[in-house]
C-alpha cells in the first residue's frame, strides 16, 4: 500500500547531501506522493523547483506565521502568482504561532487573513499551522468562513475538544511522528476521537521523526510507524490506515486516487 506524505520540507538544508538519492529511493520504496510545503519566500521557490523536477512531488505555496515579518505587498504579489503554478495544490503553510514573541500577533493575523483570502480566490485548500494560538486560529477561520475553503490542520496538537471545531468546518487533521511519542497523551486522545476519514498522514520532514527514530532526520517512509500506532488505536490494519489516508490526501489536494503514468 502506498504512502502519501501530505506535508514535508525536502527543500530543507538537512537534505542537501543526499536529496536526489533519497527522493528516488523513497518513491521506489512505496512513497507514492509527497506534498512539499513552502514556509518562506525562498523555500517556496525551492518547493516549486522540486515539484518541477519530480513528478510525484507537489507544491504548497504560502508563508509560515513565523516568517510573515518578511512579507510586504511586493512579495505577496509574488506569492499570489506562485500559487497559480500548475503543481501548486494548496496555500500553506499559513496560520498563527505564538510560541515565539516575533513576529507580533497583529502581523501574523494580518497575513493569515490575506492568505486565507487568496486560498478562497484560487479555490485551493489551506494548510493551517497553529501553535499556542488555538482560540485566535479558530476565531479567524470562522470569521473567514474557512469551512467553505477547506484544508488541513497541520501537525494537530490541540485537545479532543478543539478538534470538534475543525471537524465542524470539514477540515482534515495532519497526524505525524508525535503520535508515536510516549508523552503524547493529548494527541492520542484527539486521534482516537477524530474519524479516520478526516485524517491525513504527514512527516514534517526533516522534523518530528517518529519512534524509534525520534531525534533523527525524518523521512517519508517513517510514516509506516505512525500508521502502525494509528491502526492499533482504531483496531484496524496498517494497510487500511494507509489506504484510507491515501484517499483522504487525494481528496484534500484534489488529486486522482490512481497515480498518473508520469508519477509511477
Please identify what each model-predicted range represents:
Residues 1-264:
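Mid-domain alpha/beta scaffold segments of enzyme catalytic cores
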Amino acid at each position: 500500500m502506498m504512502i502519501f506524505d501530505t506535508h514535508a520540507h525536502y527543500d530543507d538544508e538537512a537534505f542537501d547531501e543526499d536529496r536526489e538519492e533519497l527522493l528516488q529511493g523513497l518513491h521506489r520504496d512505496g512513497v507514492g506522493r509527497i506534498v512539499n510545503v513552502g514556509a518562506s519566500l525562498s523555500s517556496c521557490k525551492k518547493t516549486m523547483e522540486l515539484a518541477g523536477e519530480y513528478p510525484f512531488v507537489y507544491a504548497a505555496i504560502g508563508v509560515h506565521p513565523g516568517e510573515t515579518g518578511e512579507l510586504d505587498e511586493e512579495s505577496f504579489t509574488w506569492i499570489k502568482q506562485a500559487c497559480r503554478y500548475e503543481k501548486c495544490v494548496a496555500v500553506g503553510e499559513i496560520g498563527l504561532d505564538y510560541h515565539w514573541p516575533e513576529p507580533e500577533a497583529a502581523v501574523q493575523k494580518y497575513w493569515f487573513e490575506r492568505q486565507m483570502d487568496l486560498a478562497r480566490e484560487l479555490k485551493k485548500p489551506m494548510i493551517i499551522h497553529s501553535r499556542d494560538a488555538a482560540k485566535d486560529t479558530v476565531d479567524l477561520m470562522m470569521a473567514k468562513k474557512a469551512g467553505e475553503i477547506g484544508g488541513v490542520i497541520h501537525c494537530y496538537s490541540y485537545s479532543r475538544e478543539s478538534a470538534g471545531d475543525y471537524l465542524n468546518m470539514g477540515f482534515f487533521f495532519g497526524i505525524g511522528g508525535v503520535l508515536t511519542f510516549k508523552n503524547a497523551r493529548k494527541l492520542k486522545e484527539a486521534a482516537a476521537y477524530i474519524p479516520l476519514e478526516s485524517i491525513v498522514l504527514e512527516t514534517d520532514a526533516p522534523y518530528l521523526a517518529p519512534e524509534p527514530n525520534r531525534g533523527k532526520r525524518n523521512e517519508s517512509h517513517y510514516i509506516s510507524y505512525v500508521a502502525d500506532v494509528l491502526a492499533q488505536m482504531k483496531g484496524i490494519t496498517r494497510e487500511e490506515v494507509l489506504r484510507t489516508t491515501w484517499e483522504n490526501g487525494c481528496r484534500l489536494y484534489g488529486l486522482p486516487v490512481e497515480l498518473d503514468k508520469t508519477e509511477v
